[in-house]
Structures are given as C-alpha cells and as structure tokens.
C-alpha cells in the first residue's frame, strides 16, 4: 500500500492516509445484520480494511435491504487468513464446529485479498452467539480478521420495497 501511495502522489493523486487515527463517519453495507445489530461483512473480500475503518470511525452508518436482516446469522462467515496458515486455520476452524472452504475465483484460483491474504468462507450453521464465535476464530493463529463485526452501527438504514426505508438507531 505504501508503494502505491507514493506512486499515486507522483501523479498528484491523493489516496486515503495509510496511517489512520480517526474518521468522522463511515457509510457501508452489510451481508447480514442480526437482531443485536451485529454484522457479517466481507463478502467482497475487504473485511480487514473494513474493520479497521469501522473501528477508527466516530460514527458508523450501515445501509442494507430488508433481505439482509435476520434473527440469527445463517450464512458463511468470511475469515481472512495469512496464506502460510491456511491448513492449520482450516483444521482449527473445523475443531470449533465450522466447515471452511477457500474462496475461489470463477476460474478456480484462490481469491487473494488486497492485502495478499486468502479468505476462508466458514459455515457454522445458525450463529446464536456471534461475539463468542468471533473471539474463538480470532484467537486462531494465522487469522487476520473475522467477518463478524460486533461494533454496533450508530444508524442503520433498512431499505424496503418501493423506495421506502426504516431508520434503526
């Protein structure tokens, strides 16, 4: 990232600072939102950066259509993993009840994040205790980030049909 930032500056392009302290507000989406306003994010593969930005933000605003709202999470949890740790992380996620599979591109190659890591999409069935599961996964050596975000958004815009929406605070 530092090299890209320096190259961009040569072309008079200004990128986001690579050393973040505080951000006023983050607007983002979510793959799922549970009844406790926890989020599953990372379907696009940028979960490490998304989590850094959300945790640096003074205010977090999430926008999602009504299909993304669930009582309990029931979709795969993205887990960003250092490539060297893929096999051990896969075994350890299986030990805590997950069914991990490496995210691949259409042509069968592994999906590589913008940070050079891989994503394991992990099925845990219905997740009733997301914070505890996040902590278990995060404690596995080689796991860089988990797609369960437990920082509660300040505002959620829930899009409904016909252009209507609800504001959840």
Regions inferred by a protein language model and the residue ranges of each:
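Binding-site signature for planar aromatic cofactors or substrates
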Residues: 6
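Short, small-residue-biased leader/transition segments that mark boundaries at the very start
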Residues: 1-2
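Conserved phosphate- and dinucleotide-binding cores of soluble alpha/beta proteins
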Residues: 9-169
């Amino acid at each position: 990232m530092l090299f890209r930032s320096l190259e961009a500056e040569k072309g008079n392009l200004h990128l986001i600072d690579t050393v973040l302290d505080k951000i006023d507000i983050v607007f983002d989406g979510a793959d799922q939102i549970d009844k406790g306003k926890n989020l599953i994010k990372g379907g696009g593969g940028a979960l490490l950066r998304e989590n850094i930005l959300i945790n640096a933000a003074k205010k977090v605003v999430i926008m999602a259509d009504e299909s993304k709202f669930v009582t309990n999470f029931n979709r795969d949890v993205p887990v960003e993993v250092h490539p060297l740790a893929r096999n051990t992380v896969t075994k350890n996620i299986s030990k805590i009840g997950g069914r991990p599979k490496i995210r691949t591109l259409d042509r069968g190659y592994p999906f590589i994040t913008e940070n050079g890591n891989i994503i394991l999409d992990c099925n845990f069935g219905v997740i009733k205790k997301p914070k505890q599961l996040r902590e278990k996964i995060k404690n596995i050596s080689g796991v860089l980030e988990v797609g369960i975000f437990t920082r509660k958004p300040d505002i959620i815009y829930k899009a409904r049909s016909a252009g209507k929406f609800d504001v959840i605070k």
